[in-house]
Amino acid sequence: MFVKILPPEVRRKIAAGEVIDAPVDVVKELIENSLDAKATRIEIEVVKGGKRLIRVKDNGIGIHPEDIEKVVLSGATSKIEKETDLLNVETYGFRGEALYSISSVSKFRLRSRFYQEKEGREIEVEGGTLKSVRRVGMEVGTEVEVYDLFFNLPARKKFLRKEDTERRKITELVKEYAITNPQVDFHLFSEGKETLNLKKKDLKGRIEEIFESIFEEESSEREGIKVRAFISRNQKRGKYYLFVNSRPVYNKNLKEYLKKTFGYKTIVVLFIDIPPFLVDFNVHPKKKEVKFLKERKIYELIRELSSRKHTILEIPTLNQKTESYKPTYEVIGQLNETFILVSDGNFLYFIDQHLLDERINYEKNGNEELACRISVKAGEKLTNEKIKELIKEWKKLENPHVCPHGRPIYYKLPLKEVYEKLGRSF
């Protein structure tokens, strides 16, 4: 058999298949383009799980009119110019293959207005063939519409999952990018209904909103590598999310290490900030997998974090007198006959007295209704002895974080923030 050179249209479809093999891949590439364009609001709309339509609209800086036709060409990128630039990639996109791949396997429309221009440009591409270019009136930003994904690749289209499955994958992906970009509003619409509405927040607030759980934060840094973990324990099942330089990534060994280190019933959201030249995102066409140059150092930092995972609050024996308590620890008292205030020297804890007592009683008798009925109530004045008794029992709880109904037992306020707000050093 003789070697043959494949026609351009065949090579184009093969290359596109390496980057795009499902609707979620399209959404990923378009969200990354929006984030690289400094968008602060991103709208994603899907119809039939993205098989019929994917639309992503942002308020980023837009695409310059001179570049509007270039963006659908293979290798068209503004992120890198030479091979050595791959060692210092700080953007999501850098290969210049995303829009080329998407437009090769769909009916594609892109409209964009550059922030220095008074009008926008629109291009239409079908199966890799440019159909039209025209001027359009629009706001600054970019909007991409992808119709009939894989219309020209029936074999690939046949292997797409059910609409609900594709929809769930897209929802999970949007949540991942929302986690690592809390400064951006994310809105997801499916079949005309808004299914996600995530307003900009601080990072911890965004994570707690998405997972509807209380998280503790730990961080460690060494030799220019910083590891930051948000941890929520005692879940029904564990979930483990890894972000490297703000990019959602997958690393099988690291995920297994997180499971073994933090436990199989813990949600762990791990951020690794590492110099670009110490990490390789160019392992796979989808940039989902990564390799580290100093992987052992990352494991050491994670192990250091895990050693603190049970030190949320170290409470001394409360039958001692106050004077003999550790100097960094203090039971302050009761607030509004509803909360018990406790400080460990670094944080001030507002503990809901009813929820705490309810958790204590539930772990003793296993009956939610009975535990609620016999527990102290909000609005009930507690003696110092009762407060000490509750705190002592709190230390022994199997799950000291949430009540039997899943509500958080306490809120933790960093004293450092209080000092900073009042212009004092901590």
UniProtKB/Swiss-Prot annotation:
Gene Ontology annotations for the cellular component aspect, listed alphabetically: mismatch repair complex
Listed SUPFAM superfamilies: ATPase domain of HSP90 chaperone/DNA topoisomerase II/histidine kinase (SSF55874), DNA mismatch repair protein MutL (SSF118116), Ribosomal protein S5 domain 2-like (SSF54211)
Pfam families: DNA_mis_repair (PF01119), HATPase_c_3 (PF13589), MutL_C (PF08676)
UniProtKB keywords: DNA damage, DNA repair
An annotated Gene Ontology molecular function: ATP binding
Keyword check for DNA repair: yes
GO BP, one annotated term: mismatch repair
Domain of life: Bacteria
InterPro entries with a match to the protein in the record: DNA_mismatch_repair_CS (IPR014762), DNA_mismatch_repair_MutL (IPR020667), DNA_mismatch_S5_2-like (IPR013507), HATPase_C_sf (IPR036890), MutL/Mlh/PMS (IPR002099), MutL/Mlh/Pms-like (IPR038973), MutL_C (IPR014790), MutL_C_dimsub (IPR042120)
Family assignment from sequence similarity: Belongs to the DNA mismatch repair MutL/HexB family.
Its job: This protein is involved in the repair of mismatches in DNA. It is required for dam-dependent methyl-directed DNA mismatch repair. May act as a 'molecular matchmaker', a protein that promotes the formation of a stable complex between two or more DNA-binding proteins in an ATP-dependent manner without itself being part of a final effector complex.
Protein name: DNA mismatch repair protein MutL
Organism: Aquifex pyrophilus
